[in-house]
Every structure is written in C-alpha cells, then in structure tokens.
C-alpha cells in the first residue's frame, strides 16, 4: 500500500511541476475527447463508438494519436493554449461539417470535398436554407471574435523544443506504423480506398488524414517492363477490330437514378419508372456497380470513360482533381477517334464543376456543351435543370457533324439535396416508409425520376427514326443520397452500390444480360458492337473478369498514368484536344448604343452571355438568343465590344466570334 501511495505521489509531483508532462498529457486527453466527440457525430450513436473501440482497438488508438499529434504542435508556441484550442476547433469543425454532409449524402467528408467545393449562391441555395446560412455566418463571426480575444488573453508558457520535438516525432512514427501492423492485432485490413468503408471501420480522423496524403496509384511491388509486357502481350498482339458501319454511340449517365421498385414493401401511387422497366425487359441490361453511394458522379464518369478502376487510386480520390489536371489519359473518346467518330460531352449543369472544362480535353473530347450554352432550360423545385433539355442537345450534336458521333451525356435533374416537403411531388408513397421526412424526400425523388423516365421515352422515340444507326446506353451514376439502407432493398436485385444499365438501339443490337462494374461498361457495349480498339477495351474483352484480372488491371493503369508507359513503348501517345464549348458558334454581328443602352446582336446567346467592353465585364441583360444589352455608361467609340460565356463561378469559357456579315 505504501508503494502505491509513493507512486501516486511521484506521479502527482510530475504533473504539478513538470510542464512538459502536463503539456503532452493534455494533448493526449484532448485527442481522446475530440475522437469520441467526432466519432459520436459521425456514427450518431455512443454505442457505435464503443463498437469501433472493441472491434478495431488499434484503429481507435490511431485516431486518438493522429489528433494528439496535431494538438502537440501547439507545444512549439508560447501561446500553447490558444493554438491548442485553435487546432481542436478545426477538428471539431471538420466533425460538424461531416455531420452536415452525412445529412444529405451517404459518403463522409474527405479532403477532396474541399477541392470540388463551389461556394456560389446556387450551391448554397440547394444545400442550405437562408436561415441556416445566416446562422452559419453569425457562428463563424463569433468564433473568429472569440479566437481573437483568446489570443490576446491566453497565458504564455515555456517552450521545451527538444522534448516536444522528440514527443511529436514519436507520435508521428506511431501514426505511420500502426496501420501496417498485423490485422490480428486489431487494426484490420485497410487496403481499400472507399471512404465509406474506411470511416466505418477505422474512424473519421484516420480516413480524413489518409485522404489528404493518399493520391495516385501505388507502384505495384512486381512492376517492371517485363511484367507489363507479359500482362499486355495479348492486348498488343490483337489488331483493332470494328464493323464497316460504326453506329453513333450515346452514353447517358443518369444522375442518382435507380429503379425504386427495388425497395422492399414500398408502394407508390403510380410506377415512377414504367418505361425504364420496359427497356430492361426488351434490351440488353444488367446491374451496374458504381464506385460510390450517394455521391461521386465524376468518379463513375471517369471509370466509364477511361475503363479504369478508381478504387486503385488514393483514398476518396477524384482523378479529375489530381492526375487529369495535367496528364492526358487514354479513353473511349481517344480510342473511337481511330474509327472516325467525333466526340462530345453534354451536361445540363455548369461546365466548371469537378473541373470538367479542364479535364475533358485531356480525355480526348472535341466539344463540351453545358448549361452555359443552352436556352429555354426549365428547372425543378430546388434549382436543378430538367433533363428533357438533353433531347434537343443530343439531336443537335448528332446533326452538327458529318461523321458518326460518340456523345457522353450527363444528366442532373434528380440530384439532391431532397426536400422533406415538396410542392411539386405528384407521386406519393402509399406504404412502406413511416418516417415523414424520408417519405417526403422519396416522394420528391420519385416525381423527379418519373420525369426522367418520360424524357427517356421521348429521346428513344426521336432516335428510333434517326437516319443513322444509333446505340443509347442508359445507367444511373450512383444511388441517390437518401437514407436507404441495405435492409430496405431486395438484395437479390442489387445492393447499395448497384444501379442498372440498359443498351438500347435503333439498329437491332442484342445480347444477353450481364452485370458489370462501371469500368467494364464501355468494353461491354463495344463488344456487342463488334468493336475492339484501345488498350483497356481489349484487356477487358480478352480477359475473364476473375482471378488476377483486377491486379493486372491495376498494373496496367499504373503503367499508363504513372509508370514508364511500357504499354505505349515509352511514349505519351495522347495529346490534349482543342476542345470547343458548344456545338454551334456564338457570334457577334453588330453593337450599337440606343437609349443609353449598348445593344449587341448576334446568334446563339444564352443567359450566361456577358458583354465585355475593352476586356471589362458589364452587367448584362439577356434579351434573346439574338440580343443582349448593358448600360452604355462610359462606352466610347472605338471600344472593343465582345461577348463571352461565363460560368456561375466566374470562369470565362469562350468568346463569341465577330461576324459583321451575319444574317
């Protein structure tokens, strides 16, 4: 007993007199507290936090140590209290942001979300109410004011740099080593990069930190020129193959679209998707495994276009925001150019989201038609463009070129966030959903996909009579960001990662139903068309989708993007295209002053057309596709007047062509 008393006395003395021990102990306790609070917000259940502790104790410790390490950085400043509270506030802010993100989608917050975030009024209006935004602004102002006061008033403490450095290095090394310890010790297998599974099994702090540093495809252990040649031997030997009459190929990526009839015991006032169900019965179809749930449109897009597996990249990574910012990548657009197809992208949303305006030239596309180049666009209740505008744009793209076309179309109408109360929800949930909020969201969603279903019927009616052979590939990019659990789905009809695809044609394309992953869809479509061109098209078509297939695909992907490009004989064979925006020229015919207003006349103007005078943007009023106007204040004879298409975030996309002789 005396020994225990002496030990406790010694420990107390260290705590009382040893500021070094107190500092690091405070960081550890702060990290433990932060981890419990952040996990509680993420899992919304204290018992679920303890399940993480019980099932993956090392993972729980890893999160605590990551937070402890970040807090330990405050010990290098005399104002350790201020910087400790500041660092803790940042982590709490991330936890709150994650809680908010999870209120309208399934996947947790990751570092890439800050790269793709667009804080314009259209974004705020969809995902946040005006009162909530005002409260957020007030909270941020109060927080900043509080931090300023704290900085002025917090006491100063001595800095023990050598000790603090040693402790921080030990903490950092522990954070790096723990994930690589044997799974039997309690961390578990963490080779996958899906943020949903990682956060669920290993915690938010670990997953978020990993998403900050984990990008690209890791070099395979056995990577070598010999290994790549062995994998690609049959691909390199196989000659390109295609029929003499290659059809138009249209991919139609349907935002958050799935057949709600897959929901168990849920009945609606009418079938929301009768035509889609008819297509599934009469056309080649199957389940389509998306790389994510409730979000991640760009990654589904990336997989279909490039035929690469995004899960081979970093944690939560969007290749659009990393490697494709600088590097061209082989794609179906590049491959089908060999067969003479012009390539287009059509999207009834802004051009700059996910940096598509930067990425698509590096994927080989010739044109990109976006919301900024469309007229007469109707919007739904929460502001997303309705998909029926796409019929006109698809027909226009087919008509504007003499050659056959590859058209990659991206819809947006059923996008979240879904309102709990809707003024436009015509389809009602009759049974199966008791929660009023989810029922209201489901009724809104069902109404939106019903309109999409009608758009699909209209589009196929138009394409049925098109004079050229045309193939239309329909699929949902991912499940909607609704609180749909596995228990609500008929799992015999696919899980949370599965939507469905259909291959329709006006030229009798047939084939057996087959389930695919997103990166296998293009090769599946081309196989039915007797087309075999391109590295990964051949690889997917020539290999059974089992065994070493996934590992070999990963090696090829690494070689093509990050390695020695052995498969391309050491060269980069793909050049960024000179992609144009829209399929029709926007022209300026004349500009003149009338009644103190500058009137600009031309062709193909849209509500996103902005008048520029000597390079300066003017507040512009859209009158029609033939005329735009602005105040003539300060405009003098000889000033250069032009019109540019400007995205919602202010990015200038293109400039009108001067055509003084236009009719």
Where are the regions a protein language model picked out?
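Transmembrane and membrane-interface helices of multi-pass
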Residues: 2-198, 637-640
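N-terminal leader/auxiliary helical segments
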Residues: 3-16, 20, 24, 132-145, ...
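Membrane-interface micro-motifs in multi-pass membrane enzymes
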Residues: 111, 196-204, 294-295, 385
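Alpha-helix initiation and N-capping motif
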Residues: 114-117, 201-206, 225, 273, ...
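Residue-level preference for non-acidic, small/hydrophobic
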Residues: 120, 249-254
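Membrane-interface segments at or immediately adjacent to transmembrane helices
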Residues: 178-251
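Solvent-exposed soluble domains appended to multi-pass membrane proteins
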Residues: 236-244, 254, 259-663
